[in-house]
């Protein structure tokens, strides 16, 4: 056990010497960061030794933080301390009580019934929302979330599908974990409640799986997405401090839009981490499509695309590290990247770089800008693992089949 602990310690430290772990912005005193990291590693290793965790770790820092605990259902809110990247400070409903959803039907957008998911998410208090049993929830209108909420699907098979889906609008500290989100439709031209004290008229929604509109400190982890009317996950209108991790995405065209428009300057402060996701079967483009802002795309598995994987316009900074890109068997779709809506004379100054990516089946990444530009400091949020480890790091992406009383 001592040798195993020593190896784990050395492995983690070696990564951290070359890349800042869990930081969303550069820091003036790197030595203080190293000291803090040492404390975190020591605490983590000690805790895992005590609980016998070392034998089940995978190298995925999010999963290794909680999945080895056979009593995870008794410690649900510890998940909030496992986030990484730019959304690492999203605590969701960690400091609130547990709310159990018991009713999968009876969705009333204005007067939600207690026990329904809508009743839970509009409350003012922090809540950690779980589900009594397996259920499929078909919403009549978009589910407008209030701040400091966690939707935690572990222990049940929870599907939100067949209607409008989740909206995170001008709120903060949201965690969405362990649910299936698919076949989302447009809603709107209707009254919808957003808090216990307010409901209002909603225009037509886009039909996204998760729409983040002016939201901050958002973490979407271990969800399965497919086949929505617009995007699977879109973040626009000044949204920032977001981590999208361990998700499995399939059967969709425009997967992920990050940034409202080329002219919307508030998105210049957007920071998003995209880590340990599997972009799978039936996807076409936008994994993601970025505007303005800073985007860290790290240790994802790209096994399918038809047009391109990563694209953008309006001078976004894209830091691609340790990903695996398997190009399709389409002659003119081998390029990972797409610089959009600008001539080469302009986009060649945008800061896009590939570092340690594995490019297969003829895949190629077209870099631009300065490889050592200082802007990458704002697009670095965790230490990348080698691309050779992407398979095991992403092998359990998507909603997990967690059962109480056993490791998840």
UniProtKB/Swiss-Prot annotation:
Alphabetized GO MF terms: metal ion binding; pectate lyase activity
One Pfam assignment: Pectate_lyase_4
Coiled coil stretches, renumbered: none
Catalytic residues (UniProt): 286
Any one biological process term the GO annotation gives: response to nematode
Binding site for Ca(2+): 206, 230, 234
Family named by the database record: Belongs to the polysaccharide lyase 1 family.
Pathway: Glycan metabolism; pectin degradation; 2-dehydro-3-deoxy-D-gluconate from pectin: step 2/5
Cofactor note: Binds 1 Ca(2+) ion. Required for its activity.
Catalysed transformations (reactions): Eliminative cleavage of (1->4)-alpha-D-galacturonan to give oligosaccharides with 4-deoxy-alpha-D-galact-4-enuronosyl groups at their non-reducing ends
The protein's name in its UniProt record: Probable pectate lyase 18
Tissues/organs with expression: Expressed in flowers, but not in leaves.
Highest taxon, organism lineage: Eukaryota
EC number: 4.2.2.2
Cofactor(s) demanded: Ca(2+)
GO cellular component: a single term: cytosol
Keyword Nucleotide-binding: no
InterPro entries cross-referenced by the UniProt entry: AmbAllergen (IPR018082), Pec_lyase (IPR002022), Pectin_lyas_fold (IPR012334), Pectin_lyase_fold/virulence (IPR011050), PEL (IPR045032)
Annotated signal peptide: 1-24
Keywords: Calcium, Glycoprotein, Lyase, Metal-binding, Signal
Glycosylation sites: 42
């Amino acid at each position: 056990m001592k040798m195993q602990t020593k190896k784990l310690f050395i492995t983690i430290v070696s990564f951290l010497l070359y890349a800042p772990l869990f930081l969303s912005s550069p820091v003036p005193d790197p030595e203080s960061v190293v000291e803090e990291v040492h404390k975190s590693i020591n605490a983590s290793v000690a805790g895992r030794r005590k609980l016998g965790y070392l034998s089940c770790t995978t190298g995925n820092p999010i999963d290794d933080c909680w999945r080895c605990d056979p009593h995870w259902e008794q410690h649900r809110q510890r998940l909030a301390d496992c986030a990484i990247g730019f959304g690492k400070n999203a605590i969701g409903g960690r400091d609130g009580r547990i709310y159990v959803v018991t009713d999968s039907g009876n969705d009333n957008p204005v007067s939600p019934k207690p026990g329904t998911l809508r009743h839970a998410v509009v409350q003012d208090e922090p809540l950690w929302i779980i589900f009594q049993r397996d259920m499929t929830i078909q919403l009549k209108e978009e589910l407008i979330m209030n701040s400091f909420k966690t939707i935690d699907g572990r222990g049940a098979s929870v599907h939100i599908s067949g209607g409008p889906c989740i909206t995170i609008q001008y709120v903060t500290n949201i965690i969405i974990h362990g649910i299936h989100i698919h076949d989302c439709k447009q809603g709107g031209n209707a009254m919808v409640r957003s808090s216990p004290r307010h409901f209002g008229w909603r225009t037509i929604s886009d039909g996204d799986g998760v729409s983040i509109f002016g939201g901050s400190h958002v973490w979407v982890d271990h969800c399965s997405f497919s086949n929505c009317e617009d995007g699977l996950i879109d973040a626009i209108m000044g949204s920032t401090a977001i981590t999208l991790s361990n998700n499995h995405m399939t059967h969709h065209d425009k997967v992920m839009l990050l940034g409202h428009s080329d002219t919307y300057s508030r998105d210049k402060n957007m920071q998003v981490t995209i880590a340990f996701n599997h972009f799978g079967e039936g996807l076409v483009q936008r994994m993601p499509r970025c505007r303005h802002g800073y985007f860290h795309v790290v240790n994802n598995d790209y096994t399918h695309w038809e047009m391109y994987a990563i694209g953008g316009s309006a001078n976004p900074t894209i830091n691609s590290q340790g990903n695996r890109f398997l190009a399709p068997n389409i002659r003119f779709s081998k390029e990972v990247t797409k610089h959009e809506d600008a001539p080469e004379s302009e986009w060649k100054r945008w800061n896009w770089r590939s570092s340690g990516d594995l490019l297969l089946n003829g895949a190629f990444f077209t870099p631009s800008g300065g490889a050592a530009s200082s802007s990458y400091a704002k697009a670095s949020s965790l230490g990348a693992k080698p691309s050779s480890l992407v398979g095991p790091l992403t092998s359990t992406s998507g909603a997990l089949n967690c059962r109480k009383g056993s490791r998840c």
